[in-house]
UniProtKB/Swiss-Prot annotation:
Protein name: Nucleoid-associated protein CA_C0126
Species per Swiss-Prot/TrEMBL record: Clostridium acetobutylicum (strain ATCC 824 / DSM 792 / JCM 1419 / IAM 19013 / LMG 5710 / NBRC 13948 / NRRL B-527 / VKM B-1787 / 2291 / W)
Database matches in PANTHER family: NUCLEOID-ASSOCIATED PROTEIN YBAB
A molecular function (GO) term: DNA binding
Assembly information from the UniProt record: Homodimer.
């Protein structure tokens, strides 16, 4: 076996592979921090309800226009809130997936 490596591979190749893996890990950490600091907002019902989520996928704000608060139709308001939250979470997920694809060159790496 070659010194510092695997059969058929020079020791320098292994060092390069380790450096590339460390660089990739740093890029992923930087991207994750960047996304965690972003906010994603979705508005539904013609502007009646909006929800904002962080890149950590935590709901940070919900805005409801007073005119949509109808005590006789609470179910509609609940549906609007759910829709706004789900849409904002979807935006956050799409952004995360898009950035990950850029970083991995489109490779689908399980667990990332």
């Amino acid at each position: 076996m070659a010194k510092g490596g695997f059969p058929g591979m020079g020791g320098g190749n292994m060092n390069n592979l380790i450096k590339q893996a460390q660089k990739f890990q740093k890029q992923m950490e930087d991207m994750q921090k960047e996304i965690e600091n972003k906010e994603f907002t979705a508005t539904v019902g013609g502007g009646a309800v909006s929800a904002t989520v962080s890149g950590k996928k935590e709901i940070t704000e919900i805005k409801i226009k007073p005119e949509v608060v109808d005590p006789d139709d609470v179910e509609m308001l609940q549906d609007l809130i759910l829709s706004a939250c789900n849409e904002a979470l979807k935006k956050a997920e799409e952004e995360t997936s898009g950035e990950m694809k850029k970083l991995t060159g489109g490779l689908n790496i399980p667990g990332l």
